[in-house]
Amino acid sequence: MAPLSPSRRSVLFFVAFFVVAIFSPLCRASTGDELPEFKNCVQACIQQECDVDSPKSLPLHLQLFLWTCPSECDYVCQRHVTHDRIEKGQSIEQFHGKWPFYRVMGVQEPFSVIFSILNGIQFYRGLQLIKREFPNTYPPKGIYLFGAYVGMAAWFFSTIFHTRDSIPTERLDYFAAGGLVLFNLFYAPLVIFRPFNSTPMSRSEQKFETWVYVWGIICTVAYLSHVYFLQFVRFDYTYNMAANVVVGLCQNVLWVYYSITRYDKEKRPWAFWPGFIVVWMTCSMSLELLDFPPLFDALDAHALWHAATIPVPMWMYRFLVRESKDDIYGKRLKM
């Protein structure tokens, strides 16, 4: 067998590292739920505070975030058991798949909320950049604008989920995140292969080659089928993660291919930007491997992952603006 070229070795490295970074966290299980002291604490709290004629009323700010007497008991017991384990020199355990974060004004994961908001703001900035830099006659402009809205929606639902974890907020977060991942795969071939006429055209002219519309239908059907399965057949965490990993791998391979081939053809340094973003995102996701107990009871590896993704949207939008210049000014060399 002939040895692999450096470019192919690079692609395989990114693929392997991405898979390890994503799937390794799935190997860890939450054990705090099964601790006898936690179960006994929750049971006693509910009996004494909730299953009574006049249950204790929660503060208004907790009620606004849909905290109930049983969920308050669960939170209080998490904090109590964790404090006792620290005092005894025992390890901190996760509860319901999460670390026992210190709640701030009813917000469960304050740092993840802050970083999710900042990510959403970056997509809003990208939206304004697209509106300002792309002429209306540039065919992909509408797709890029739609992508910015998808990104803002994804981080909005991430903010809601990290504010208050519940089945509805969790599923909205997962569905929106999956939509963003799949949309990123949808538009990657449009940037790489440019199946459109960049010169001004009449409204009756077809903006893109036919395969783009077919590709869009395939992505839409795949997304709707994915959501339908999770919502109405079985909400399978492993399947959901695997689906997102496969889609993410596909787009990462495409972007690495773009960076290598584009730079080889035109020797333009900015052609490496997508490849750099792939490396950055892969390393950022590897933060999940750390999965340490939260610093200050609030900052964990998952929150740091969200922090690491904050600059990525604007990096990508600035790349799209720079990449489109040759299209807009008629200097494009077809790949």
Residue ranges of model-derived segments:
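N-terminal membrane topogenic signal
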Residues: S5-V11, G142, W211
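Cleavable N-terminal signal peptides of Sec/SRP-targeted secreted and luminal proteins
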Residues: R8-A29
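Multi-pass alpha-helical transmembrane bundles in non-GPCR membrane proteins
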Residues: S24-M335
